[in-house]
């Protein structure tokens, strides 16, 4: 089986136009990538990395900058990634969204992988207009059973997934806002059935799903990929 294309991690880092703090931790920051014309909804971008401390927001900087270059203001959120303390990550994402909502009234959440998980959960607690989840971890019980990323769920939760249903998108009610899941058939990091099963369970007028052949996990956040225009199209349809 071929490995995932991780070349997105090799793209040059692009500095934000502005960085603000929403808490005292060095991880409680938001990077802003801003277009000249800020008439569109704010995209709140949440990175993945299986909630692990070694993966931060910087690998999403090229994606954020490319969105800004197509006219979307972007808030790239960092959050604390503390082993065994999932509430720190979720509360940080919620608080960061609350911070940007002081200036922007129309927010679209985009999360990738573990960031997609956090976006789907946080959307129950914040005032967002829509969610786009890219290869999201929608089912913590299944991820735990499959031992994805060598025990990532156990490390994240510090407890069995069965004890934290409020953190599991599959076990939460369907969202009342437009929710779009996007997944690549060749994803080796988060099996595509995570999105397929979630959409089947939460079926309704607010739930949309796109899957792409010959696409893996990281192409979804690579601004050079064929998927980037599709994400821009979905954003436009939601704004």
Predicted segments — roles?
Residues 54-64, 75-106:
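Catalytic nucleophile-loop/oxyanion-hole region of alpha/beta-hydrolase
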């Amino acid at each position: 089986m071929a490995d995932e294309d991780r070349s997105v991690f090799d793209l040059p880092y692009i500095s934000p136009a502005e960085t603000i703090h929403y808490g005292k931790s060095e991880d409680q920051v938001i990077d802003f990538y801003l277009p000249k014309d800020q008439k569109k909804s704010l995209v709140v971008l949440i990175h993945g990395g299986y909630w692990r401390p070694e993966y931060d927001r910087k690998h999403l900087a090229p994606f954020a900058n490319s969105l800004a270059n197509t006219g979307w203001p972007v808030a790239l959120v960092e959050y604390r990634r503390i082993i065994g303390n999932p509430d720190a990550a979720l509360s940080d994402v919620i608080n960061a969204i609350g911070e940007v909502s002081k200036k922007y009234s129309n927010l679209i959440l985009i999360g990738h992988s573990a960031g997609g998980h956090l976006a789907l959960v946080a959307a129950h607690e914040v005032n967002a207009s829509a969610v786009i989840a890219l290869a999201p971890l929608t089912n913590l019980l299944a991820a735990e059973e499959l031992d994805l990323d060598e025990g990532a769920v156990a490390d994240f939760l510090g407890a069995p997934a069965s004890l934290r249903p409020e953190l599991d998108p599959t076990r939460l009610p369907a969202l009342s806002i437009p929710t779009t899941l996007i997944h690549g058939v060749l994803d080796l990091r988060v099996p595509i059935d995570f999105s397929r099963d979630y959409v089947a369970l939460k079926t309704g007028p607010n739930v949309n799903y796109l899957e792409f052949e010959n696409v893996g996990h990281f192409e979804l956040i690579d601004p050079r990929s064929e998927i980037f225009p599709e994400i821009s199209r979905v954003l436009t349809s939601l704004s």
